[in-house]
Amino acid sequence: MVYQHLGLGDHFICNGLVNYISENPMQKNNTDIFTDIVMPCLSRNIEAVSYLYRDNKKISLLKVSDDKDHRPEVQAYSQNHNIPILMIGFYGWETTPEGWEETFYKQVGLEYFIRYSHFRLPKEPPPTMIKPPQEKYILIHNQCSSQTFELNIESDLKKIYFEETYPIFSYLELIRGATEIHCVNSAVFHLVESFQNLQAKLFFYPIRPDPCRVSTKWKTIGKHKTYL
């Protein structure tokens, strides 16, 4: 079992890690472990994470409660099925000089580039896909779970905003075809960051107090501690 932080953005950050482990099993006492991986997943994220790992047949999801501490559920499943738990990100990341995202990989002995080299989306498109307009456009995500932020974007291009009424993966074609993408720290930001060959210009707004690793492919609008 791979037990990571369960936010949707964390699933995007750790997708490369989980794919790598599923293809290169760890060993304990000369025996492969984590050859088939169970991953706890919050109920509200089941649809998105199921799609994310649809092509990886070694991954199965354990749905856990959204509204309470899920560790007892995870530990009970581990004990009942006699499977070990690989815990990622529950210790040590607060005081490291790297971004906490990179620490997740270091905790299991992996280089951070694996986040990108092993990030994969399914070959088949999701059930719902929003078609891009014919004209050039800017894609904007200015929301988090608690509020919406006003971003000062001066452009004559058409502006398209992420809306919570649509699944996150329904925006894949819009992400790939955008001229610019503007994000606050969110699951959308971590999804966009995981792509390697986007043509869009990327803009990050450090409005939220939560720090995150911002790579050099983003232009940061405002003050932010950047990890390179």
Which positions does each model-derived feature cover?
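Catalytic machinery of carbohydrate-active enzymes
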Residues: 1-228
